[in-house]
Amino acid sequence: MILPTIAIIGRPNVGKSTLVNRLCQSNDAIVFDKPGVTRDRTYQNASWGGKEFQIVDTGGLVFDDDSEFLPEIRTQVFLALEEASLALLVVDGNQGVTDGDLSIAKWLRNSSCKTIVAVNKCESTTLGISLASEFWKLGLGEPNPVSAIHGSGTGDLLDLVIGELPENNIQDDEEKIMMSIIGRPNVGKSSLLNSICGEKRAIVSDISGTTTDSIDTLIKKGDNHWKIIDTAGIRRKKNVKYGTEFFGINRAFKSIDRSDVCVLVIDAIDGVTDQDQKLAGRIEEQGRACIIVVNKWDLVEKNSSTIYQVEKELRSKLYFLHWSKMIFISALTGQRVDNIFEHALNAVNQHRRRVTTSVVNEVLKESISWKSPPTKRSGKQGRLYYGTQVKNKPPTFTLFVNDPKLFGITYRRYIEKQIRVNLGFEGTPLILLWRGKQQRALNKEVERENIELIQKD
């Protein structure tokens, strides 16, 4: 089951994200002393008193201003409240009650959601009680003084929170498939997330950099539960200023690290850029499963051969991910969006797959029968004794040979291709470890494991 949700709501810059990080004991919400840092609604898991729940951080709520992203942020806050079991209204104790606080309180009183008031920036316990008392006038019950920075009062606040939450059954992240949506700014990542979820889950704008957090969304497709991470667009380092975008990009790279599968989004109009290639390299370096999604395909003028020509051109520049499935979609119209889950699931399954040693050696034996290991000018020839899979995520194989130096890059690529093609490894990188060992040192090992050597000295 999806965990019960607490929606963090309040005016801009009252310390909502700092409080989220304190309650969740993490730094996943971007904290920066500037109003409007949080735009989308972002989710984190937390636990207290034996209960686990989900906290959703929302953007600063303003009712009387329609500039910049404020209308879109309002929509995100409304959606967060609709799915919440409890609302936590955060106010600034130093500023006292403002017109903005009163407007939000009136809106919350008219909703059906239970609300707890957290009076933030009450660093002094004695003064905090005095500052908090002013917020009785919001009409939402007893105000609770806390300090998000120092942590004071947050334990009592969490006691109140869990007392209002329903019982829940917990599904661990280990049971979910973690899928991150990766790409440059404005390639349509948030539009894709919205299309996948069937709702306006992330703010969509033609302005680059709209998403500054990594956004986690839970969704069920068939028998599988997915956690989808929409990341901030990743730019060249020289174009990144210190601030929220800097933190967001670092968060996006961390999203790659915690993913089971990455969806690399490419703009069909712009094609592959240098930054796309760097992202592809990053995914390959981290050993993640991946599918390539070419978005905005509806905007391309095409004939019967266009898709083949475009795929060939894109693949020539994304050679890091030559093993990835490529899908041409339109996040705007929904064209082929549902195919993403099918191919992503296949990539994850291949990424987690294990193959028996006997099967690996059948493939290797067949491969060298078609193309023998190279022979040096000195007359010394490479010998491949046997291979075995030593781990998965990604599939990693150790190949025992007489001398790794005798196996050049061309032959190594040939063997990798044979393993991939014959065993059906699509959507995942493969790692081949070439280990030099004398045959006599292997004899006891292969006898114990009942392995037949492919080649002998």
From Swiss-Prot:
Where is GTP 2 annotated to bind? 183-190, 230-234, 295-298
* Positions with a binding annotation for GTP 1: 10-17, 57-61, 120-123
**Which Gene3D superfamilies does the record associate with it?**
3.30.300.20, P-loop containing nucleotide triphosphate hydrolases
User: GO molecular-function annotation terms?
Assistant: GTP binding; ribosome binding
Query: Which parts of the sequence belong to the KH-like domain?
Result: 353-438
Return the PROSITE patterns for the record. Answer: G_ENGA
The chain positions of domain EngA-type G read 4-169, 177-352
* Source organism, top-level taxon: Bacteria
GO:BP terms for this protein?
Answer: ribosome biogenesis
Q: Name one Pfam family in it.
A: KH_dom-like
**Keywords in UniProt for this one?**
GTP-binding, Nucleotide-binding, Repeat, Ribosome biogenesis
InterPro entries with a match to the protein in the record: G_ENGA (IPR031166), GTP-bd (IPR006073), GTPase_Der (IPR016484), KH_dom-like (IPR032859), KH_dom-like_a/b (IPR015946), P-loop_NTPase (IPR027417), Small_GTP-bd (IPR005225)
Q: PANTHER family of this UniProt entry?
A: GTPASE DER
Family membership noted in the UniProt record = Belongs to the TRAFAC class TrmE-Era-EngA-EngB-Septin-like GTPase superfamily. EngA (Der) GTPase family.
* Role noted for this protein: GTPase that plays an essential role in the late steps of ribosome biogenesis.
Question: Assembly and partners?
Answer: Associates with the 50S ribosomal subunit.
| Official protein name in the record | GTPase Der
- State the gene name recorded for this protein: der
